Every structure is written in C-alpha cells, then in structure tokens.
A protein has these predicted regions:
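Class A (rhodopsin-like) GPCR signature focused on the TM5-ICL3 interface and adjacent 7TM helical core
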Residues: 83-95, 127-136, 157-189
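Extracellular TM2-ECL1-early TM3 structural module of rhodopsin-like
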Residues: 25-87, 94-104
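Loop architecture of class A 7-transmembrane GPCRs
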Residues: 53-75, 97, 103, 108, ...
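Residue-level signal for the membrane-embedded core of alpha-helical transmembrane segments
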Residues: 3-6, 76-83, 168-172
C-alpha cells in the first residue's frame, strides 16, 4: 500500500528539486503525478478496505465519507485523463517549433487550473447521488443513479467532455507530430 505513490513521489521530487526540470512540460507532469499520488493515498486504501472486508470499518459507511471518497475518486481519474491532452499539446509545440517559446508559464498554469476545475465540476453529480445502501445485510457505498434522462445526459456529457474529446485530442496531436516528422525525413532524403 505504501509503495503505490512511490513512483509519482519520485517524479514529483525530481521535477521540483532540479532547476533544469522546471518547465511547462514538467508542470503538466507534476499535475499528473499529484493526481496519481492523491488517488493512491485517498482512493486506493478505501477501495482495498471495502473489497477485503466490508464489515471491518463501520465509519467508512457514513454518508459524508462515502460521498467524499467516490467524488474524489472521480476527480482524480478525470484529472489524469484531462492531463494527457495538455502534455500532448506541449509535445506538439516542442517537436514542431523547437526554437520558439511554446506555452507560457501563465497559460500552462491556466491549463492546470482548467483541468482541476473541469474535473471537480464534472464529478459533482457523483457527490450528489452517492449513498450508503444495504445489500444482503451489508452496507455498501455506491452511486445510486435513477435511470432517467438526467442520468443519461450526465453520462453522455461526461464521457464526451472528459474522455472522448481528450483522447481524440491526444491522437490528433500524435498524428500531426508523426506527419511533421515524416515530412522532415522526406526533405532530408
């Protein structure tokens, strides 16, 4: 359990400690590492306890704790997904325009703020619908969605804005980078 955040802590430590590594790229990498650390320290222990022995810790099943844990789980997962397009954008500018100023510090800070804001706003409905329920004489912490139009709209909007578009953006930048590198190789020959 203690080894889970170790890799991300090492990444965070090395990018913060070394002045050469204080760049826009590393701001995005630090953001990704922070999300991973938070998930491994907050969400993973909760999930392990629930999976291993649902009877052991009654306090986990309080409504507030249950809601906070599910909400944070969704936030950290969303931040992780949303960080990849920012890294892809930075890589795109670094490869295609290596000698120019790419993304400013202010813009990269704004992008990180946007990532966290988007993740929190997109995860708020989970906080609202999470509850403690009894299943087979055991309390469980779960999302209790009513299968309604509102739920369908939330799922569609969340998946489009937080999963599909970010993944598509990453693929787009990778294709553009590949195309640019292929074109530069053809010019050399």
């Amino acid at each position: 359990l203690l080894s889970l955040p170790t890799g991300n802590i090492m990444v965070l430590w090395s990018t913060c400690r070394t002045s050469v590594l204080k760049s826009v790229t590393n701001r995005f990498i630090k953001n990704l590492a922070c999300s991973g650390i938070c998930a491994s320290l907050v969400c993973v222990p909760f999930d392990i306890v629930l999976s291993a022995s649902p009877h052991c810790c009654w306090w986990i099943y309080t409504m507030l704790f249950c809601r906070i844990a599910k909400f944070l789980h969704k936030v950290f997962c969303s931040v992780t997904i949303l960080s990849f397009p920012a890294i892809a954008l930075d890589r795109y500018y670094s490869v295609l325009y290596p000698l120019e100023r790419k993304i400013s510090d202010a813009k990269s800070r704004d992008m990180v703020i946007y990532i966290w804001t988007h993740a929190v706003v997109a995860s708020l409905p989970v906080f609202a619908v999470t509850s403690v329920s009894d299943v087979y004489a055991m309390s469980t912490c779960s999302e209790s969605w009513t299968y309604s139009l509102g739920h369908l709209i939330y799922v569609i909007i969340y998946n489009i804005t937080t999963v599909i578009v970010p993944v598509a953006v990453v693929f787009l930048f990778m294709i553009l980078i590949r195309r640019a590198l292929s074109a530069s190789q053809k010019k050399k020959v």
